[in-house]
UniProtKB/Swiss-Prot annotation:
Gene3D superfamilies, A to Z: lpxc deacetylase, domain 1 (3.30.230.20), lpxc deacetylase, domain 2 (3.30.1700.10)
Annotated InterPro entries: Ribosomal_Su5_D2-typ_SF, UDP-acyl_GlcNac_deAcase, UDP-acyl_GlcNac_deAcase_C, UDP-acyl_N-AcGlcN_deAcase_N
Listed pathway(s): Glycolipid biosynthesis; lipid IV(A) biosynthesis; lipid IV(A) from (3R)-3-hydroxytetradecanoyl-[acyl-carrier-protein] and UDP-N-acetyl-alpha-D-glucosamine: step 2/6
GO MF term list: metal ion binding; UDP-3-O-acyl-N-acetylglucosamine deacetylase activity
Name of the protein this chain belongs to: UDP-3-O-acyl-N-acetylglucosamine deacetylase
Catalytic site positions: H265
Gene name per UniProt: lpxC
Disulfide pairings: none
Function: Catalyzes the hydrolysis of UDP-3-O-myristoyl-N-acetylglucosamine to form UDP-3-O-myristoylglucosamine and acetate, the committed step in lipid A biosynthesis.
Record key words, sorted: Hydrolase, Lipid A biosynthesis, Lipid biosynthesis, Lipid metabolism, Metal-binding, Zinc
Residue positions binding Zn(2+): H79, H238, D242
Amino acid sequence: MIFQRTVKEMVKTTGVGLHSGNKVTLTIKPAPINTGIVLMRTDLNPAVAIPAKANMVRETTMCTALVNDEGVRISTIEHLFAALAGLGIDNAVIEVDAPEIPIMDGSASPFVFLLQSAGIQEQSAPKKYLRIKRTVRVEDGDKWAEIRPFQGFRVNFAIDFNHPEIARSQQHMVMDFSSTAFVKDISRARTFGFMRDIEYLRANNLALGGSMENAVVLDEYRVLNPDGLRYEDEFVKHKILDAFGDLYVAGHAIIGEFCAYKTGHALNNQLVRAVLAAQDAWELVSFDKEADAPVSFAMPGNAVFA
């Protein structure tokens, strides 16, 4: 039987909020079977819990944000969720003392390290996978995203930026998912942005915590970060990282192929909602044997380092 997973121990870190620029403390705690991922705002009295569900994603400008019916929000969840998805964590309580998850270095790698430091605990209930039975597609102008049946989890992603540095890099990638491939090839890819946008963002109280410490920054011609890129194709890899996180609000690891062109947080969430709404397009499945599961996660205790 392939079992659900949580973290073995509580683990905590502190970072900066990308949009607020303020210090944020993040705590990850174990959770019982069938809890899912629950985020909690501990700076509010009483604390407010927000379950990580597709219909709770109500803001997708510059990041993915969960917002409850009372307007309480937790923003910038996508990199943490990519790490949770990449390591196959089904159940956890995520406490944060601010309206956003800390940006850390702009990638999922610090969250992978945090989860591996906490340890991964198998639980007593079977892990449920969301298996795609028919293709579901969403479009917005020339942008599109779809998910189709596939015996595994594959990502086929293309970006198209009219920028000389990005144009020089590979802008299309196909990846068959495994925990090892995610940690080594995707998790360290950082978010990126353009100098020309920063003034506008800061005038709107966004990206106040953004810097070359937590993003790849480009001017009109080149990457400005002194150390350059972590991967030659870091741009498309970061978009794949974002997609991993955005898709995980489906509540389960996906068995299918995610194909996308120029998609972002908004279209990713639209796709998840469209899939869940089309009840004939998917089914929940479990597996008795590791060898039978088409999606592979590293075994607990076997840390995979980038």
